[in-house]
Amino acid sequence: MSDTTSTIIFEHPLNEKMRAWLRIESSLQQLTSQRHLNSLASSLAFFRTITELLEVLERGEVRSELLKELERQQAKLKQWAEIPDVDINIVNSFRLKLKERAIALSKAPRLGQSLKEDKIISLVRQRLSIPSGCCGFDLPTLHLWLHLPQSERDKMVAFWIDSLLPLQQALDSILELIRQSAIFRSEISKNGFHQNTAEGADLLRLRLPLTPLLFPQISGHKTRFAIRFLPLDSEKGSVPAHLPFELACC
């Protein structure tokens, strides 16, 4: 992805829960952008993303963790509503949205189950781990499916993506609030290194100038973190002795 912005935001999870949520968010965003399947290449990219998403969903208690977080965020909003001069209408609107997200998520079938049981998805998943294992002679079912009218394939893809809607809406609401929970503060790294504490934070967000083409290498956990800034060009690039950047511990 490229654009003309002068800054770039990097994010780093400080616990396994946030790591899984960011991976799920990334997969859901990819599925949305890949949903127009008009070739074997675009279809395999879509099915590969579904496979990666299902693997993440199978590893932990994603639904229960999200429901706990929705409840925690509602409790925080309830406290905010008691702050003098707060816009009570905005706070109540967010609380209502979180409540609706929690109800929809709790009532939804097992996350990803309908995708796992789908015949086309199941057949492709079995072949994706085999190098070039999705040729027409390997998957005649997929070969035939790709020759269905585009409208029929679009309808099936829409059904698959819509089955993930309770998950996507709950996760989007949670991550929006977490990202907005802390403001960016100015920091300066010395000789390409910075360390600090992040008590109670789930997510680090760094905003860097696009030039001089540096990226952060972050190590950390729920209480402390360290950032090493490295040049994109490891041979010719360099890191300023004092690098200004912005940091938010969310």
Swiss-Prot record:
GO terms for cellular component: cell division site; cytoplasm. GO terms for biological process: division septum assembly; FtsZ-dependent cytokinesis. Its main location: cytoplasm. It is found in: Cytoplasm. InterPro entries: ZapD, ZapD_C, ZapD_sf. Gene3D superfamilies: YacF-like, YacF-like domains. The keyword Cell cycle applies. Keywords: Cell cycle, Cell division, Cytoplasm, Septation. Coiled coil: none annotated. It comes from the Bacteria. PANTHER family: CELL DIVISION PROTEIN ZAPD. Interacts with FtsZ. Cell division factor that enhances FtsZ-ring assembly. Directly interacts with FtsZ and promotes bundling of FtsZ protofilaments, with a reduction in FtsZ GTPase activity. Belongs to the ZapD family. This is Cell division protein ZapD. The lineage of its organism: Bacteria, Pseudomonadati, Pseudomonadota, Gammaproteobacteria, Enterobacterales. The gene is zapD.
